[in-house]
Each structure stands twice: as structure tokens, then as C-alpha cells.
Swiss-Prot record:
The active site is at D160. This is Death-associated protein kinase related. Gene3D superfamilies: Phosphorylase Kinase, domain 1, Transferase(Phosphotransferase) domain 1. Its EC number is 2.7.11.1. Residues 312-343 have a biased composition (Acidic residues). Residues 526-541, 555-564 have a biased composition (Polar residues). ATP binds at F43, A44, R45, G46, K47, F48, A49, A50, V51, K66. Residues 37-295 form the Protein kinase domain. Belongs to the protein kinase superfamily. Ser/Thr protein kinase family. The gene is Drak. It comes from Drosophila melanogaster (Fruit fly).
Amino acid sequence: MFTEKGIFPIGDGLLDVDADRLKGLLVSCPDINEIYEVEQTPFARGKFAAVRRAIHKNTGSHFAAKFLKRRRRAQSSDKEIKHEIAVLMLCEGEDNIVNLNAVHETRSDTALLLELATGGELQTILDNEECLTEAQARHCMREVLKALKFLHDRSIAHLDLKPQNILLAGERIEDGLKLCDFGISRVVCEGINVREMAGTPDYVAPEVLQYEPLSLLTDIWSVGVLTYVLLSGFSPFGGDTKQETFLNISQCALTFPDNLFGGVSPVAIDFIRRALRIKPNDRMNATGCLDHIWLKDDCSLDRQIYLQPQSDAEEEEEEDVDDDVEDEEEEEQVEEEEEETQNVEEPTTEAPQQQQQPVQQHQLAKSGQIHSKPTHNGHHRANSGGSISKIPIATSKLQSTPSSETTTAIHTLTSNSNGHVHKPTQIVTPTRRASDSDKENTYTATFVKKPVATIQLGSSNGIEDATVVATLTLFPDAPTTPKVIRKTPTGESNGSATSVKALVKKFQLEDSSGSAVARRSGGAVTSSSGLHSPTTTSVRLNSIRRASEPLTTVYKKQTSQNGCSSTSNPSSSPGSSPTTSGSTATLLIHSQRLGNSTAPASHCVAVPATATATSSASSSNSSSGKSTSAAHHLHHHHMHHHHHHHHHHVVIAAKNAAAVAATNNLSLDQGIIC
């Protein structure tokens, strides 16, 4: 594939150079400044390269020293650098490609001593003049395509064709152009699939964005974009963002506004359209672009550009002459008909006035039969619903009585009043067809649905097994402790001074006693809500939702067993009191020392680590039976039931211990540790 000795492919579209072949270009001196006088300020800079002017100290020759970093993104870039050197060596001697003169290597970078193009970049001319003339653009594209053809004949795709990589050999475009920067070029041939996501956003082809195999025709897409930019000064697919630009490229959203392409020849637009095809196989190759009529022959192109408007003008003149002849014939026929009508009318003053209107109507009808297009001042206009046609009617030769006046009137009427029936024009917008690979450019719409307040899902087992899904709000409140509002007990409403701490703890004991009674009785649970009045209300456990619970909470109704109502998760019932709502209710009651205790230490309940409530109650001989039976029952329940059901038994024991403490006149501050 490559005739050059010492250059060979290494895979992934890259080339390598043999060490013996590379020695002929390497500069033996370790310091480049000893041989060349290198300017410190670069006149071109890229991501991984900087170009500075270098002057040979012995010969005085000027070069463009391109300094390439040998490490990019913490990885070695020796393969890419050698590939660029190999491509430049293959292009040695080509007039439209910069030549490589020498290579200098250091630990940090590699310097390529390239041919210096004194005219600078083509982008500089576009920045100063906005766009080129069509003759300049044609000459520029011809030079670029010659360089591309040289590369494509060697199965090399440039893949980064843009005005910044096209250099002027002199001050003018006519002095010659040279192609440069082969850093992302790749070898593309049959049997080698090369996929690269590299290039300039405005110039990349659709197959690059779709990560499809590249080909030599990928450069032809950039040729079409470059031609568009040179003729108009604007990017054909440029958007506000890169994503919008890529979408326009994938859909080939190509337009030619009149304010940009009003003076551009149709063959130039045809050249752009043939190059900008979504499918690579539908595009022209480099040879086909050079053979296109826009680039092939300047003289024939100029003749076609100037002869086409001239032929259009001649056709318009012929149509005008035919229309004038038809107008004269029409006027003669109208005059004859009016004379015949005037001969049969009576010599009265009202008859001519009554007869003039039918004559005019007949004339208009006749005019509609003769002309398919209305005329206005000798110019043709298309028949549209909103257009106005002015038709002159000649009546100067009519004989009239002294009481009547003959005038020449111009009647204005809409063009849809003609005799011919015109079909309405149907504007059909051509459907833009994307490539087969363009399957990801879809538009999605987001619909926001508000949740339903409460949804009840029934089951075949009846109402008791039904599941209630409560979905109340999209933004639940922050998890906070519910506030408890209660009235002052009537027994302490007198003037006796009682501490707030004692009252609160007394309320906790009373509420614990009330909850225990409710759990014993079964059925409904009596509780007080933190946001309502303190009156007790019988409610279902599955009808209340905390503000701190998740967005959607599922509650299941439980059936009562053994006369005791319980839930699988007591902490999720907001109607319970603070003593029973969690597993951290701290209640430790100490009674007075008693000599005789019938409750041994082994009967004390070993509460799990998650619960910190422990009941250790000892009393006199009369109350020891209650404490012993309560502790024994709690221990027995812990051995045979799930550990989540231990809370209400602790409350029962606490209630009995509180009753014992009340009978022994214990103070509240002595028996509670918060």
C-alpha cells in the first residue's frame, strides 16, 4: 500500500517510521537553540502544540517549528507524533502540502521544522473580509481538493479540514495554498474500521458523531462546509451550543438564505449540496469534486452565469410582446361589441347608463377568457387570492346622446373573479430524511402528574385485608416531633404550686396508663392528636399519616387477637402517646425497700438493646403478687412472640409500679430519670 521505504501501518489507522529512515531527519544537536534562532512568542497555538518561527543560524532560512508535547493527558504521544511525521514524509514534494525539513527531539517535546507559509492562515482573510468572492472561493477549493486527492490516493484521510489548517503561500489567495496539521489524520482503506471522535464541531461529518467507521468521503463533508463558509462567511450548521450544532449536522439542516447567497451561482450551491450528503456513499469523491462544473472550467461557468439571466430576459420580452398583441385584439373586440350594443339601444337618457354596466361586465368576462394571467402595467404576476388586477377598458369611440357622458374607466377587481377556475396552490414542505444511523435524535416531553390523595386497593379477603396507599403531597414536611397539647388537670387547678417538670412527667404516667387500658380492652385505640383538641377520639390506626413519613406509605389493617389490638410497627402509629410511640421511652421506677420480695431476680425481663425501658418493681407483700405476675407475663411473651410487641407489656408493668408508688406516697422526682 505504501511505496515509501521504512513507513508501515501499526493499526488503528496509524503509521510508524523505521528508525533508520527517521535518522535522516533528526537533528543531532541536543539543544535546538544552537542551530536555530527560535522566537519565544508562538504565532499559532493548539491544545498540544505551539508553532514558533525558527531561523537557521547558518543559512538564514525561515521555518515553522511545531513543538509537540510528548506526553498528553498523562500518556505518551510518541505514536501520534511518529504518525504525523510519517504522513508528512509521504507527502514530500507535493505543492499543496507543507514540507517537513527536520525533526528535533527532547525529553519533553518534539519539534517539527516545517515549511513556512508567509501568507498566514486562510482564517485571517475571512476575519478581515468576512467572505471571499466566488472566483476566490473556486480557486481556493481547487487547491484544497488537489491536496486531498493526493492524500486519498494514498488512503489517508485528513479529518480536520478547516480554514485554520489552510495556509497561504503568499499575500494573495492566487499565490497558492498549502494544507497542514495532520495530527488526527488516519489511514482508511478496505478491511480497516477506524472510529474516531475527533475534529472541529462545525466541520465534522455525521458519521463521526454517530461513531461509525470513517472513510475518505468523510473529508468531502468538510469540503462542503468549507465552501459554504468561504462563500457566505457563516457556518451552515452552527448553533448556540455544541449539542445544537451536532443535531443540525445529524439532520443536515442546510439552508441557503438570499441575503447570503443572493449573488452566488446555482452551480456553486449545487456543488455544496452534492458534498453535504448524510450518507457517505452519496457524496462525490475528490476526483468528482474536481470534475464538477463549478471547478472544472472557469470560462464555461462564466458564460453559463451570464447567459442564463440574458435568456431569462429575452423570454420575458417575448411574453410581453405576446401580451401586447393580445391586449390590442381584446380592445378591438370590445369596441365592436360596444358599437353593436349602442346601435340597438333607444335614444333615452337612462338607457346608456343602464347599458354601460352590462357592457363592462361582458368585457370583463371576455377579458377573463382571453388572459390566463392578469396584467398590471405590462408586467405579469402570479394568480393569488390577494392580488389585484387592473384592466383598462376603452370606450372612447362610442356614440352617445347629449344627455350621456362617455368616460374611460379603470375597474379594480380581485383576480379570483376571472373566468378561469384556478386550483389552490398547495405548498408541500419536503421532508428532511436523516441517515439510517440517526436514531438517537429524538425529542422527549415530560408530563407532570399530581398524585391522588388516597387510593384504596381492595382484596379478595374482604375489607379487613385491604391496603390503603396514602399519597398526600410531593414535598412532605421535615421530620419533627409532634406537639402535644393538653389541658391542666382539674385536681391541680387550685393555687398549689407545682413544677412544670412534675406536671409533664405526671402527664406521661397518666397517658401511659390510658394507653395500657386501651390496649387491654381491644378494638379501637383511644389517643389524642397533637394538632387537634385534647378530647379523645376513637380512630383507626391506618387512617393517620405523619408528616415525617415517606411520600407513599402503605398501611395494613390488622385483626384483633386475644382481645388485644397491636400493630406490626408501633412507631408508625402517630396516634400513640410519647411513651408508646418509640422504643426509647425511658421509664425506671424505684420503690421502697421491702424485706420480703416474692419476685426473684431471675424473673426480670431482659429487654432487647433497642428498647431502653426497663421495669423493675418491688412492693410490699400485698403488691408483690402483681409485680411478679406482670414481669412473668412479660418474660413469657418475649419468649413466644415477636420482640416488637413488648412495648405495651412494659407499659402495663409501669402502670402497676406507678400505682404502688402512689400508695406509698412517693414523689415524682424520685422515681423518673429522663
